Amino acid sequence: PLNIDPEKPALPISHPFIYSIYLSKLLGSFITLGEANDTWALNEGALKEAPFLELTYSNHKEWEGMLFNALAKTKRGAVVCVFETTDSIQHMFFRYLDKGHPALKSAPAELSPQVIEDLYLRMDGLVGRVREELGPKDVLMVMSDHGFKSFRRGVNVNSWLYQKGYLSLKPGKKESAEWFKDVAWESTKAYALGLGGLYLNLKGREERGIVSPGDEAEALRAKLSEELTGLRDDFTKEAAITEAYDRDKIYKGPYKDNAPDLIIGYNQGYRASWDSVTGIVNATVFEDNSKAWRG
């Protein structure tokens, strides 16, 4: 949450340490926030769409300057530059491409689906300008961290676990505040955290685990996977979850145990609800996504 002055950094924000100082003196001051584009301000209505786009493209211009400076200096080796622009704008403006989305009613009509098309035209132009800087033996790679689909409905997996008896709350509680504040771990078998992870409350791994590793854990994973796969949204009559994948069946390698016990695969239009992501338990399993972040 801190924007550290790149010219006089109070903390190391580049390697080597003087690189941010060099860039700021050469190109001017620049944003150093980890999440530079303020998507949450737009989500909460503190920032309107037009100034959000202005902010996002201002940051984009700074990253372009750094990229072309690095390309000009680097005669041998790799130059890597990450642009948040495509991610942020699509998260916040994908609703314009989905006429049935619940958040569309609050969206300014004048922005229209043209926002994302304009974004890709701009990025295509950037790729062309980078290619002009490359030599005959240079290789250009363009990569994305994920694709996009509409996020219409949220699924609170923790609420579902509570209703099914896999997650327990403290005496007298029917809901839990974020980060599982009111969860009774001594009688909880499973919990969900993040966008797609479901974890067993495993002995020896969780601080107050009750599920024994081995046969008990494997049987519980199989049961949860079976019950979650095809979970139906009574409002839309659609399957919200296409499959809950057992990590031992889809992952291999030395870091497999770092993954959630089950990976939840959501159907098109569905995602973990905002409350479920941060461990909130409430009375609602399914809900409309009314926020601007809908891609």
Describe each PLM feature range.
Residues 44-71, 86, 121, 128:
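A conserved hydrophobic secondary-structure block that centers on an alpha-helix together
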Residues 283-295:
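Short, cationic low-complexity segments
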Residues 92, 99-101, 161-164, 170, ...:
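Alpha-helix boundary/interfacial micro-motifs
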Residues 1-29, 33-52, 108, 114, ...:
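Secreted, luminal/periplasmic, and some membrane-associated catalytic domains
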Residues 59-95, 264:
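Active-site regions of oxyanion-processing enzymes, predominantly non-cytosolic
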